[in-house]
Amino acid sequence: MEINMAEKAAFQNPYPLGVSFKNGIARISYAAASKDSPCGIVWYDKRTGRQLKKETFFREERVGRIYCREKKWEDMPKPEEVSYLFWEDGSLVPDRYAKGFVPQPAFGRERSGKDLKAVLLTERYDWQGDVAPEIPMQEAIGYCIHVRGFTKHISSKVEHPGTFAGVTEKIPYLKEIGVTTLELQPAYEFIEKKRPEKSQTQVHAPVFEEKKPVLNYWGYEEGYYYVPKAAYSYSEDSAREFRNMVRQLHISGIEVIMQFYFPVEIPRTEIQEILRYWKLFYHVDGF
């Protein structure tokens, strides 16, 4: 494969990881599990799930284990009409750095990697002059909630129970009880229902016991850290619904802080990048 110097220069800058789109160019960076594994990206129709195109990354595009590609957006639907998955060694791999996903199954349903097709966020959000409340710590009155649990019960009397929109509907209640700082338990995307690995029973023959799926209600595990949880969104656009919630809380003088769970394997530099993203893109007030 021949490559000109302009393309080569672009390939040498693998960050940020994931896929972004700007000025008719899709910028793709994928960190492979192994530098020797064949890998690439698969594009889908966002609505139907139909495969549009499968691409393979080339050795010349690799920096260490990271493959970098800039792709002119030609012979493809509009960016907002497509989704994608990476592939490696024949397996489909969700983008850990995705900023959004296609609509997801209801909370508590089993999901696999192929369900987590990522989407490109191309629409700008109008924050309408949003300003952080900046409540002095000595004056803060905190209130910690699980987004789903806070309004899911019928007694909450909201139109959109168990969602970010439901939290927005409860702002008058939060004001009434004097809350200045709302703390959210994990509200990023995570796989809440998993089937544990089969375990070998204590018998002479190698018989394996099929375990039932277990539910992680709280979300304290590694997740897709850049995306508000789809099951906590009434609409198909969890990013917009989350930002609407933050903006309305700020208008009412209430701060929003978030809890994250990071296993020890996540580098501190990546943690800083994630938190910075939520501050800049979602206007959250702290962690």
Where are these predicted regions, by residue range?
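Hydrophobic faces of well-ordered beta-strands that scaffold small-molecule active sites
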Residues: 141-143, 182-184, 256-258, 287
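The feature marks proteins involved in alpha-glucan
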Residues: 1-25, 50-54, 61-146, 151-159
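Conserved, mostly hydrophobic/aromatic
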Residues: 30, 145, 174, 184, ...
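Aromatic- and acidic-residue-enriched carbohydrate-binding clefts of CAZyme catalytic domains
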Residues: 156-163, 195-251, 264-284
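Extracellular/periplasmic catalytic domains that process cell-envelope and extracellular macromolecules
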Residues: 134-139, 175-176, 251, 280
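Catalytic domains of carbohydrate-active enzymes, especially glycoside hydrolases
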Residues: 169-188
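Short edge beta-strand/loop segments characteristic of extracellular beta-sandwich folds
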Residues: 26-33
